[in-house]
Amino acid sequence: VFSSAATENLESGAVNLEVAKGDRIKVRDCLYGLMLKSANEVANGLAEHVSGSVPSFAKKMNRRAQELGCTNTNFVNPSGLNNAKHLSTPHDMALIAKACFDRADFRAIDRTVSYHFPATQKRPNGTDIVMGHRMISSGNADYYPGILGGKTGYTSAAGNTLVTCAERN
């Protein structure tokens, strides 16, 4: 069940799927909403579901990042939205991405081009979401053969970000 903290504490202009307090959405659907749409309230809701709160989840993220060998990463929230203490490096993000891409369940979600996100209070018919990573879709001019997946991002502080994994030969 989504809380008001998960759904209402987003910075202006943050990408979301209009999930509201009290909405019930399966974890699997949330993962698609997170990876395809970058829905920030969904990231917060998943964090609360897993750890009870966003700060507790951020602590788990930081522990896992250290286990993966990250040395210049500090997470403050699960969405990546602006926070002066939230930081990482390309090298550390590559380590995290590798761990993600090693999982078949992650790759299956991350390679999905479109998905029907289920009904919510504000969208009773659900909504179709489309992967924002243009290199994944073979019908896009930016398509990259051999791509396994990736994640786009944007914040006003960081600008456009991208981590991608591909295999060739």
Regions found by a protein language model. Name each.
Residues 2-6, 21-23, 31, 48-50, ...:
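A mature extracytoplasmic/lumenal domain signature
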